[in-house]
């Protein structure tokens, strides 16, 4: 099962774990997901975060909603070779969803070397 390959940990000590922060303004929920907040993750052609996905599981429901996915596609590569462009996308994603419900926010991040990482927070 794929769930057996997804890793987690404390984001303060593990650079791959996505950090989820949110603000609720009525029905609008503004979410920031970041990899490497406490310990920077490498961002090179050879080692980088490819994407972040955000899911929402409303309280009392059995299935998640995919809120969104952000891909990071610039990692220093150019026609001159790896790490030659000085253009890098940082693994930070912003999402806005509209809901009155409480529940869980789940974030997944994908490192091209170390695989899938997850984190969750309770949405009040």
From Swiss-Prot:
User: Catalyses which reaction?
Assistant: reduced [rubredoxin] + superoxide + 2 H(+) = oxidized [rubredoxin] + H2O2
UniProt keyword terms in alphabetical order: Electron transport, Iron, Metal-binding, Oxidoreductase, Transport
Could you say which residues bind Fe cation here?
Answer: 14, 16, 41, 47, 111, 114
Disulfide links within the chain: none
Record has Transport as a keyword: yes
InterPro entries from the xrefs?
Answer: Desulfoferrodoxin_Fe-bd_dom, Desulfoferrodoxin_Fe-bd_dom_sf, Desulfoferrodoxin_SOR
Q: Does the keyword Zinc apply?
A: no
Q: Name one Pfam family in it.
A: Desulfoferrodox
Q: Which domain of life is it from?
A: Archaea
**Record EC number:** 1.15.1.2
- Gene Ontology terms, MF aspect: iron ion binding; superoxide reductase activity
Instruction: Tell me the enzyme class.
Output: oxidoreductase
Q: Which cofactor does it need?
A: Fe cation
Which family is this protein grouped under?
Answer: Belongs to the desulfoferrodoxin family.
Q: Tell me which NCBIfam families the record gives.
A: neela_ferrous
Its quaternary organisation is: Homotetramer.
PANTHER family from the UniProt entry: SUPEROXIDE REDUCTASE-RELATED
Summarizing the function annotation, the protein's role is: Uses electrons from reduced NADP, by way of rubredoxin and an oxidoreductase, to catalyze the reduction of superoxide to hydrogen peroxide.
- Protein name as annotated: Superoxide reductase
Gene that encodes the chain: sorA
């Amino acid at each position: 099962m794929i769930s057996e390959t997804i890793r987690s940990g404390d984001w303060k000590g593990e650079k791959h774990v996505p950090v989820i922060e949110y603000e609720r303004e009525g029905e609008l929920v503004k979410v920031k997901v970041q990899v490497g907040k406490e310990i920077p993750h490498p961002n090179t052609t050879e080692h980088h975060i490819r994407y972040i996905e955000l899911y929402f599981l409303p309280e009392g429901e059995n299935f998640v909603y995919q809120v969104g996915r952000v891909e990071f596609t610039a990692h220093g590569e150019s026609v001159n070779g790896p790490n030659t462009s000085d253009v890098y996308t940082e693994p930070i994603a912003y999402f806005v969803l509209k809901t009155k419900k409480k529940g869980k926010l789940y974030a997944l991040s994908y490192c091209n070397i170390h695989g899938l990482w997850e984190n969750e927070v309770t949405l009040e």
